[in-house]
């Protein structure tokens, strides 16, 4: 068990254990540069197997205070590491929460199901993200089929280019902006009848360019 940690502005503390090889480094950032919120990074080296529990205290921790915690991406972790009670929501990554960016999750276009490895919204402070969902499972490429958010992002980028062609090159709406593209795609997104929208998984629905132009 570690003693209670007290932080100064931007301080880092490190702990070792007498009978274990585990080393823990905790870095406190009083103001995270993108949000202004407090950020704490906890790094484990050679962690001992078992359940690790963190107790948060502070002079200004109120009943309505919200604490969010995430694991590092799987490719940066070693061994089996997971939360006992995980929450799949609020798992979009930077820069997904940029206001004017078109943010997409991905789904299987063969059966219409949301893909379990895709991130989900909303934002920590309630921002409506993602904007929509795009196909991202077993997408055909010159190197074979691939799955992932990068596939959905690429398809959506192509949709944005198609919309820009119609708006600017064909002079239908030459003043289109990034926010405007976001709005057009969201309005044209196809909803699933069983979902409440905007959705943490689907945003405003599935990417549908025909419906976007019809709208």
For each predicted feature, which ranges?
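Charged/polar, solvent-exposed surface patches and flexible loops
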Residues: 97, 183, 187, 211-214
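Extracellular S/T/G-rich loop segment that most often corresponds to the catalytic His/Ser-adjacent loop
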Residues: 1-2, 6-31, 84-165, 211
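Broad hydrophobic/π-residue packing in well-ordered secondary structure
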Residues: 50-53, 117, 143, 204
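Beta-sandwich interaction modules
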Residues: 18-59, 67-72
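Hydrolase catalytic cores
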Residues: 1, 136-200, 206
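Long, charge-dense accessory insertions within large macromolecular proteins
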Residues: 62-88, 106
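Residues that cap or initiate secondary-structure elements
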Residues: 48, 60-62, 123, 138
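Carbohydrate-binding/catalytic loop surfaces
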Residues: 201-215
């Amino acid at each position: 068990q570690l003693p209670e940690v007290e932080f100064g502005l931007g301080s880092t503390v490190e702990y070792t254990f007498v009978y274990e090889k585990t080393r823990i480094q905790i870095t406190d950032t009083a103001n995270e540069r993108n949000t202004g919120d407090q950020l704490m990074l906890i790094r484990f080296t050679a962690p001992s197997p078992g359940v690790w529990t963190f107790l948060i205290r502070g002079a200004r921790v109120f009943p309505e205070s919200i604490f969010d915690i995430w694991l590092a991406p799987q490719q940066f972790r070693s061994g089996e590491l997971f939360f006992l009670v995980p929450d799949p929501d609020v798992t979009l990554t930077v820069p997904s929460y940029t206001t004017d960016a078109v943010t997409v999750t991905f789904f299987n276009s063969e059966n219409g199901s949301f893909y379990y490895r895709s991130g989900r919204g909303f934002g920590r402070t309630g921002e409506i993200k993602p904007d929509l969902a795009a196909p991202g499972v077993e997408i055909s490429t010159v190197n074979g089929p691939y799955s992932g958010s990068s596939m959905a992002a690429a398809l959506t980028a192509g949709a944005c280019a198609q919309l820009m062609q119609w708006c600017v090159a064909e002079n239908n709406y030459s003043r289109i902006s990034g926010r405007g593209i976001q709005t057009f795609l969201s309005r044209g997104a196809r909803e699933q009848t069983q979902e409440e929208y905007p959705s943490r998984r689907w945003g405003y629905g599935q990417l549908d360019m025909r419906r976007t132009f019809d709208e």
